[in-house]
């Protein structure tokens, strides 16, 4: 993985004595790749790439977005029309969101059709399903943030769905909305979920997912 010039340098040797860089490098670069692996096994990596793009573009927009019912829509218009390359950043965010969902669905189908969920990879499959649920939640919460007519009514409908659940339904609706009706508290909750809670959750499950794949390797053919 490293060239001879790098491994012979004093700086590399200094770090290698303390961090065992060479052992880590050998482990990363020497993993066995089964001969049946094809391009469809890259769908999970493409989904991760889309998530990284989402994180970067979303982080950039937080500098200008204002999560209030009075200023949310105006701030989105400001990003699109006034911020340098703001229109491009937001467009990439939207396109990569759609691409992430599509790649995730195809990845799930690939894993299911090739039996990648079977023993001993049940936990890998479970973490993947949890991440799929979180990804859908990203879409639901992000859809509301522009606080336009589409976003407002989408939130009103989605947050009202739990009302059909017996006993606790009304309490769940009030928890989601932050009150009896959709308003500032709702937008604040959805913004917090979209930019803080869900990213941390998916990061934890991604780490567990990748560590298990690394430990168990790629599943064999059917």
UniProtKB/Swiss-Prot annotation:
GO molecular function: electron transporter, transferring electrons within cytochrome b6/f complex of photosystem II activity; metal ion binding; oxidoreductase activity
GO CC, alphabetical: plasma membrane-derived thylakoid membrane
UniProt-annotated binding residues for heme c: 42
Membrane topology reported for the UniProt record: Multi-pass membrane protein
Cofactor binding, note field: Binds 2 heme b groups non-covalently with two histidine residues as axial ligands.
BP term (GO), one: respiratory electron transport chain
Additional free-text comment from the UniProt record: Heme 1 (or BH or b566) is high-potential and absorbs at about 566 nm, and heme 2 (or BL or b562) is low-potential and absorbs at about 562 nm.
Its job: Component of the cytochrome b6-f complex, which mediates electron transfer between photosystem II (PSII) and photosystem I (PSI), cyclic electron flow around PSI, and state transitions.
The protein's name in its UniProt record: Cytochrome b6
Lineage of the organism: Bacteria, Bacillati, Cyanobacteriota, Cyanophyceae, Oscillatoriophycideae
Gene name, Swiss-Prot/TrEMBL: petB
